[in-house]
Amino acid sequence: MHDINFNILKDRAMDVDPDIRFMALEDLRKFLQDESAASTRTTLNQSLENFFPILLNMLNDQNPDVQTQAIKSFEPMVKYLSNETFSKLVKKLFALVQQNSSSTGNVTGMKSFTVSVPNIALRSLFAQSNSRDKSEFVSDKLSNSNYRFDPHLARYIMDYLIPQIVGNPVTIDSIELLIDLVTEIGYVLTQDELLNLSLYLTKVALTETGLIGKKSMVALERVVALVRTEVVIDKLLAQINQSIEPTKLFVIFQLYSVCLKRGIKPNSIDTIYNTITSNLNIEATEEEDDDDLDFDNLVKENSLKDEALTTLIDLVSQHFLPVESKNTVIALIKSYVNYNPLAQDEDFIDDEEDDISFSDDEQEDDGDGENDGSWKLRAKATILTRALLKSFPDTLELLSKEVLPVFSFADSNDQVVSEVIKSSIAIVNSTSPRDSTNVSELFPIIAARMKLAKETQVPLFLKLVESLNRFDNTSLVLEVFKIIKDRKLITSGSFDYLQFYSSTLKFHDNLPPLVIERMSSDFIKNLDDKSFNMITDSIKCLSLLFHQDSLEKLDAIVDLLIYKVENSKQYPSDLVRQSIIALGEAYGRADKQKILNVFKHSIEYEGTSKTTIDVLTQIYSTDIPSEYSYLILKKLSTSIMSSTEATSVASLLLMNKIFERLPSGDYDDTAGNLVQLLAVTNKANYECIFHILIKLVGTVLQETHRAPLLQTIVKLVNEGKIEVADNSFFQFITTACNQIPDLYNFFEDGLNLNSELSAKILAICASQNKLENKIMERREEFQNYYNSNINDSRLAFDILFLGYVGTHIEVKELDVQTLIGLLSNSQLTNDDNISAASTALGLIAQKHIDSAVPIILNAYESSEKTIIRGSLVDSLSIAADACNEDQKRVIWDKVFNFPVEFDHEVITELKKSGELLGKIPVVDELTINTDNLKTTYLILVITKSLLNNLQATKVNNTLLDSLIKSSIEWLNIVNIDIRQIVVGNLLTGLHSKPDTILPILDSIILPKIFDQLQAEDSFKKIITMGPYKYVLDEGLEIRKLCYEFIYSVISLENAVIKKYNINLEKIASKIIEVGLIDTQTDITVLACINLTNYIELHKDSAVELITRDGGNAFTTMINNLKKQLSKKLSAKASTQDSESHQERIKSIIKLSKKFASVVEAAESIELAAAIRVWNEYNNDLKTNFTIYYNSTDGV
């Protein structure tokens, strides 16, 4: 938009024609909302200030549209005004507000209860910003006028307005303005100022009535929300407690609730609790006869009790209720859940007696005949039940036995019934299916009530029945359906009933015919509903319905589903896909040919192809005609080449299933596409592809496809994409050998002969085709190297080749004793040859397991060299796959109990031993208490293996819990290797077995991790190099692992962090205190990375952290970062040192840039000193490290 001429704007704004005045303001608003206006910001400030008098005058415009437009004109201009100009505008508007309040009061003699026009305009200036990102309105979040006030300006405004608001008579204008001020810029108020403001608002609430009193309570809620200390809450409550009078109790309870909901536990809980309970005594009321009741007094008493119960709910919900008061609260609940002092008899709430007609104003109680408000007390008592159960789960039994049976299910008030059902559901959901006695008493109550309940209440009772589906409630379900039938309720087309059906079907495998009949009829109607959502949700339920035994209307339902698929253009794609899934569920019981015909067509369309393939994979069996399979295969031959990975994989799975049942044949197109796919597909799909290729071996190895396939295989093998354990691949190689006699020669020429994989391939080829000459060549080579140079690099391949050949035929040159002798030869130093020999020994041992294992174990026990024992353990790991339980126990006993002195030299051996034992664990010996470091380390390695591989069962989880808790204590052992594996296991467990780690994370694990963050002298070694001495910090790797663990903790989802009460502020504090002063550059970088991650994921927590204790953590962080930046690079620094130095600076700058947003959000007077230091630090950072600062991304 072009610039605006303010001289013309003024003339138009003062025109006699209201339409012109309106358009002038509209043009101004559009101009201010245009981003290009920012380019004229310097001059715009003055122009807008000059326009103020006219705009202020227009607030009194006689035309309401112009007046409204004038009000709207203030908010967009805020971001273009200087602090000085904005302050002037606030003063002018506030003067108009005061003038309006004064004139209104003088004329009427009463306080106005409407907000003045100037006040609306003034408040619009603050509706900008700090709360906008939390607003429920999208327009707020996207607003171009979103603007954050400068803290100094916010402070000035508060200092100007708050004294005048507090120092003058209270009005609706002043209270409404105060609410907005506190909400938007209240962050600048100190705790003392918040206390004073709270005391003022408390006084207003206690002295004012009507709207002003209510609004003062709203303002107090906003103020208390900013309170961060117990001191303020306690002082505020002290004033409230001093004001307790019988006439003020109604407001007192509301004030209590405001303080309690802040979540900071006060010292005066007993006083609050006693005040509440002393006003909830109903004995006196019960003793009076109905004729003696003062109705007006009763209404007042009930209203006060309503507030008392509300406050008690808040107290209990915040977990502030003293434990010893639980039973008293339960007694109160029992007293009030059926409280009705005007009841004539026990059946006062029967619908038949509700014969009094009320006006609309009298209907609020919806059931209390005299409108005494007692229904609110019954509802609140019921809500209190849920709050108590949540805070004290151990009250479940009492609530189930004493409260649940007396709930007012038949209450004449709908709100009470709703709350009763919610609380009943809470009790039922907390009850174990093993303890169903108490909840089963609900069955007859529900059945009886559903016969008489209003039709609108029936869905509420169905929710309660749903919660009982976890128990054996088939009799109740049947009774409910009988009632529905007898009452002739319309249940089709209702999401409430559909949800009930879904839950019932989910928990009951064999429902009575009456139930299934009713459900089926409704499903048939729902499938023709006008709402696509109703149809889709109904179809999802059909998958459960089709598993029921009694289902007479199956064919009718299937026909409707078929219609949906055949006429797919009439319906949303998700609805059609759900129909296909449901047809798959019905396939086993319906007309199979009809369903197969539908799938034959739906597989052709892109929107339904993937779903159809998935369903066909589930239902495919031998009874599907071969002709149909051929048709589907033709489609799959194309879809396996889909650019969509999911479709390609699904097609492969179905194709594999079909080929398992089809006879051999000519599948040339399929074979060609599979060969192409093999070259480009994901590694995870190899197994399925080779399974299919085995079935197509006759076709795929014909001249057309042979060369591309074998070349692809060679490429995949040489690139390491095939694994030694890929059984389907080697099955294909074995099958292919029967088709191609010279396959050995092809692979020998193409494969990299330095890998175990190549050795295994060639061994299979040689064995399958009985190529004795090839085997003899390798035997002779082995003998030659064995006798001349056992460290020749070519020996490894020969050993592996003969080892794999030895799994098929006897190779006399390579028996168990020979391989053990080779491994024991002190001259064998080539690592590849050692590895090859241990692998071959394991392979040979598998074939002769009974004789080989004792020989290997004997060699293991007699060897004095750790490298030899480690190699023999590798062999046993391979052989163990063929061992029986007795043999595994022998291996365990020998290896686990082998005596060896624990030091760093045997770590590799112990790792191998632990990995072996992890495959064959003896649980009893894992849970022993030991001081032996070797045993400790072995258990830790075994634990790591179990964390990665153990299936989650109750027994296994108990074992892991025990192992983890034991290992945490081992962090006290001063040994680098042990500490490293303990922290590594905790990290592994956090990812693979979080249910084991998370419950003890904050209370047990993190304190131990924090202990490891400090560099320890016991892990430091002094190394002398010429005239210089260097300190080697061997504990560095432990600290690195700890920071990796902390990073994973910080990255947990917020729901997990909240569930397990993980204290993020404490974690961040430890990093600031310890990590940012670590002498090792790597740790400084990791500390910065962790803090940056913390800010990105948990900004609110970071704000909370730096505002605590007067900003101590904030100040510590600044000082520690300064210390890091003050470190200079040595003149003799190496290239690596220079790179580390640069990385440290960049990480600090990135953290500082990220931290700026936290500082901005936390700005307050209390942090003023720390923020000044921060600004100085930030300026120095930009000045001293300009190049790094400009090149480092802080977003």
From Swiss-Prot:
GO terms for biological process: protein ubiquitination; SCF complex assembly; SCF-dependent proteasomal ubiquitin-dependent protein catabolic process. HEAT repeats lie at residues 1-37, 45-83, 168-206, 397-434, 436-474, 703-742, 846-885, 999-1037. Keywords: Repeat, Ubl conjugation pathway. Pfam families: HEAT (PF02985), TIP120 (PF08623). Disruption phenotype: No visible phenotype. Cells lacking both RUB1 and CAND1 show defects in morphological, growth and protein degradation, consistent with a reduction in SCF ubiquitin ligase activity. It comes from the Eukaryota. GO terms for cellular component: nucleus; SCF ubiquitin ligase complex. Belongs to the CAND family. Key assembly factor of SCF (SKP1-CUL1-F-box protein) E3 ubiquitin ligase complexes that promotes the exchange of the substrate-recognition F-box subunit in SCF complexes, thereby playing a key role in the cellular repertoire of SCF complexes. Acts as a F-box protein exchange factor. This is Cullin-associated NEDD8-dissociated protein 1.
